[in-house]
Curated annotation (Swiss-Prot):
Residues 194-396 are annotated as: 9 X tandem repeats of SVP-1 like motif. It is found in: Secreted. SVP-3 may be a post-translationally modified form of SVP-4. SVP-1, SVP-3, and SVP-4 are 3 of the 4 major secretory proteins, secreted by the guinea pig seminal vesicle epithelium (sve). Residues 45-178, 377-396 are annotated as: Disordered. Residues 60-152 have a biased composition (Basic and acidic residues). Its main location: secreted. SVP-1 serves as substrate in the formation of the copulatory plug. SVP-3 and SVP-4 may also contribute to the clot. This is Seminal vesicle major clotting proteins. One of its GO terms (biological process) is mating plug formation. Residues 1-21 form the signal peptide. SVP-1 clotting repeats lie at residues 194-217, 218-241, 242-265, 266-289, 290-313, 314-337, 338-361, 362-385, 386-396.
Length: 396
């Protein structure tokens, strides 16, 4: 009697598993290697979804929408488990979510032609788990979030009438966890954060005409390389921070016409190399600070026409080398201070037409070498003081 009941229960369980497999294959497309294609068009009043595969069931449905044209196409191979959901709201509300596991190649393209032109394309190869969500709200609200594990190549492109932005990230090694979130409003605010364990190489390029705010942060354990270029006409505010354990290399170039405010800070344990160039016409304020344990090398060049205020401070334990060049036409005020334990070398050159005030102070324990040159046409005020315990050589 017990064996008969057990046999009946096992048979019912097998039938239930087969029915669940049929439902899953009907909703996702396929479980084994499958080539499927989904088209969704809603230009005037039409939307069609079709799927074909080895063990997939095809379906066709229609939905109506007004005043929005969009196109979504998906193509993938070796699709294990997948869930595709698409819903369209009115007016200008669009929500597309894709969730899949272990697909080899995929291509997603989204085009909206009326009334606003935008383009989002994602191309990746061999990702284990991914989740893509895209929603558009009114007015001009757009959000794209991508979360994936073990991504080889990723490419995303966003195009609009007034602003063109491109964000690309590629990793040679395997990335553990990544999250990219993009928000766009009026004015534009963009946030991009990438966290990796092995190696990360990123390049970000932003161009804007009206106003732009951008934050970029990279955290890694082994090796981090970043390159950032920003150009703007009206106003530009930017923060760039890099934190690493082994080696950090960063380069920053900023150009602006009206106002420019920038902060640059770097902290590392082994070696830090940085180069900063800034050019402005109206007003320029800049702070540059570096802290390191082993070796620090910094170079700063600043040019301005109206007014210029700058502070430069370097603190290190082993060796410090600094070079500062400043040129101005109207007024110029500058402070330069160096503090170190072993050896300090500094060189200062200043040229001005109207008024020039300069202070130079050096404190060290072992040896100090300094060279100061000042040239002016109308009036010059200079102070030079040196304190040291070992030896001192100075030439004015």
């Amino acid at each position: 009697m017990k064996s008969t009941i057990f046999f009946i229960l096992s048979l019912l369980l097998m039938l239930e598993n087969q029915a669940a497999g049929r439902r899953l294959s009907g909703s996702a497309g396929a479980q084994d290697p499958v080539i499927s294609r989904v088209w969704a068009k809603s230009q005037d009043m039409e939307e069609a979804v079709s799927g074909s595969g080895l063990t997939a069931e095809g379906g066709r449905g229609s939905d109506r929408e007004e005043s929005v044209g969009e196109r979504v196409s998906l193509r993938q191979e070796e699709f294990e488990k997948g869930h595709i959901r698409s819903s369209v709201e009115e007016p200008e509300g669009e929500h597309v979510s894709v969730r899949r596991e272990h697909l080899e190649k995929s291509h997603i393209r989204h085009n909206v032609e009326e009334p606003e032109g935008e383009r989002v394309s994602v191309r990746r190869e061999h990702l284990e788990k991914s989740h893509i969500r895209h929603s558009a709200e009114e007015p001009e609200g757009e959000r794209v979030s991508v979360r994936h594990e073990r991504v080889e190549k990723t490419h995303k492109r966003f195009h609009d009438d007034s602003v063109e932005e491109s964000d690309s990230a590629s990793s040679v090694d395997h990335r553990k966890k990544g999250h990219i979130r993009f928000k766009r409003q009026d004015p534009i605010a963009a946030l991009a954060a990438i966290e990796g364990q092995d190696a990360v190489k990123d390049s970000l390029w932003v161009k804007g005409q009206a106003s732009s705010e951008e934050r970029f942060s990279v955290k890694g354990q082994d090796l981090v390389k970043g390159h950032l270029q920003m150009k703007g006409q009206s106003s530009l505010a930017e923060r760039f921070s890099v934190t690493g354990q082994d080696s950090v290399k960063g380069r920053l170039q900023m150009k602006g016409q009206d106002t420019l405010a920038e902060r640059f800070s770097m902290t590392g344990q082994d070696s830090v190399k940085s180069r900063l160039q800034m050019k402005g016409q109206d007003s320029l304020s800049e702070r540059f600070s570096m802290t390191g344990q082993d070796s620090v090398k910094g170079r700063l060049q600043m040019k301005g026409q109206s007014s210029l205020a700058e502070r430069f401070s370097v603190t290190g334990q082993d060796s410090v080398k600094g070079r500062l060049q400043m040129k101005g036409k109207d007024t110029l005020a500058e402070r330069f201070s160096v503090t170190g334990q072993d050896s300090v070398k500094g060189r200062l050159q200043m040229k001005g037409h109207d008024l020039l005030e300069e202070r130079f102070s050096v404190s060290g324990q072992d040896s100090v070498k300094g060279l100061a040159r000042i040239k002016g046409q109308e009036s010059v005020q200079s102070g030079f003081s040196v304190k040291g315990q070992g030896s001192l050589k100075g030439l004015i």
